[in-house]
Amino acid sequence: MQKTYKGKIVLKESVIDGYVTVTDGVISYVGTEKPDGEIFEVAGYIAPGFVDIHCHSCPLAHAKVSPETVAKYHLERGTTTMLLTYYRDIPHERLLECLANTKKAMETNKNIYGAHLEGPYVNPKYGCGTGTDYIPNKANYDKYIEFGVIRQWMCSPEVEGTPEFISDIAKSGIVPAIGHSVASYEQVKTAYDNGARITTHIFDATGAPPTKYGGTLEVNFNESCMLMPEMYYEVICDRNWVHVRKEKLQFLLKVVGIDRVCAITDAYYVGEDTSDDVNFVGTSLTGSKLTMAMVARNLFNAGYTLPEIFKMVALNPSKAIKLMDCGEIAVGNQAKLIEVDESANFKTLLNF
């Protein structure tokens, strides 16, 4: 089956007036020359679907309760690829159920690419919520791996046993991530050398080791991560820049470049109150109420161009989890296409 769309196309480095042809779910042509066959005019901008590698919920349900509900809600708002994310406070037996449910949901919800485990091997001081079983248990984590759905798995690199854990999961094809941490440079470097390639929501739930010399600062966790040459960096981009100040995002981009920054939702809210896009439990900041469509709009309002935005909301997250045929309008890639307006506001799904 073949279909061609005509409109303004958001590419990796530019926007062109042209055509995108989809053949059997794969992009078969991108260019300015008119192809044969019926043409479907798109009023707005043709862009790759959003890719969210860190999403726990939607306003209707948590992924641990109903992965199908979460997937459907975010698909309707342009997220064509996502990782259902499970936090460290889920007990062992319940987490096994979550992974089984994810595997089943993937059969009928094609925007679920797999699971992201945010824990349980997390420094308790820098993790919100509860949970005490934070030392890696190989017997347990081997059972999680057996489901074959984990794509990204986060731990705190200062926790005992995590160097071996990171090495094990990297060998199994999972992308190790690090976060919720006060790790030293040496601990971050060890994690990186063992395979860690994603920094979980950089600048959030992190710290620095105690200073050795009065009046000076040690290298903090975030700075250590930014020194790793092939690391990707999650950033929560809410409207008022509560999680990450705009200037910190500018700093990150200046240091590491735009090609390794991944905008995420870290959505962790269930309920009717959508007056703000951040989520508080008591006085503690606990994730967001974001969709990736909201993230894209927030980035536009902060001054980023459409090609820059779609690197951060589609291409870079895909590359971070080794999904190399996604996140960019290019021949041979999955034809997951959306329409946005000139201000990056999501309009509709075009092809999925």
What are these regions (language model features)?
Residues 145-269:
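Active-site core of metal-dependent hydrolases
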Residues 49, 72-84, 88, 124-150, ...:
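Active-site gating loops and adjacent loop-to-helix segments of metal-dependent hydrolytic enzymes
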Residues 220-234, 253-340:
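His/Asp/Glu-enriched, well-ordered alpha-helical/loop segment
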Residues 49-51, 177, 263-264, 338:
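Residue-level marker for buried hydrophobic side chains located in beta-strands
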Residues 55-58, 68-95, 110-124, 148-158, ...:
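Divalent metal-dependent hydrolysis catalytic cores, especially in the metallo-beta-lactamase
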Residues 1-33, 349-351:
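N-terminal metal-binding scaffold of metallo-dependent hydrolase/deaminase domains
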Residues 43, 117, 169, 199, ...:
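Conserved, mostly hydrophobic/aromatic
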